[in-house]
């Protein structure tokens, strides 16, 4: 198996630059176990869910983690993308320390000060670069609220923007369209995009049919956008993400399996959470545990019986994950069929359900 086996040609015109509206009006490709394909609309997903099935969603929410401001002293424009809070660092309402990607990197050395203003031009948040991480060049930045912002979190919501994937370059719409309707805890740098297609009304109809809904919380990092550059995919260093599987979800999975019904994961992040929590054989509750689980063909799924997902980037670990569930040939054939039928790809794109 080579990384090139998961490569495919995709002209830029196939990359969705805006979400479908309504959310559940996007296309849905249903992939059967034998490779047969059906072309539906996403709201028809209810036809493939049975009473007693369990739908597992990732309720994480994307942080307003993109900060645009100025360097104190020179006034030069700066951009700061929050990655994750620094381990063991101060974390209070009045001060937080984050690992960040910054632009322009060469000008933001330890001691550099940044300020971020709200829409009225008032300084709401200060940032001070305190260190540079040698492994990736990220900056450690201490954030403190200013003016009428009583906390760092409030200041971030006043000045921060929702970060979009690098391949979405044209979207100027509502940031809420890059959040799922059931999102709760703000800790992610990217959305669990398979869930973007669900509306509250569709979820209610699904529940009324007798399908249960359970949650996990995987904090999506920027590593989700990394492609595999090594010729041998096994040599790829998988990124770490934190995930939570509540006891209520563990109980729901066990009850569903015992009754002979299916566990259907919404998105690769839900897959990764459930399979990571069952890595030792039995599914166990987890609270912000770290996972480096790398699912590729040859992996035996322990929990998940069906996957709802989007169309993924070439040479990505996510494409390998879905190929491990079905097969590489079936998935790659489905992708070619999607192109022939003008499906839209990636985060704002159309959906696929692997049965």
Task: Please describe what each predicted stretch is.
Residues 1-355:
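Surface-exposed, charge/polar-rich loops and edge strands
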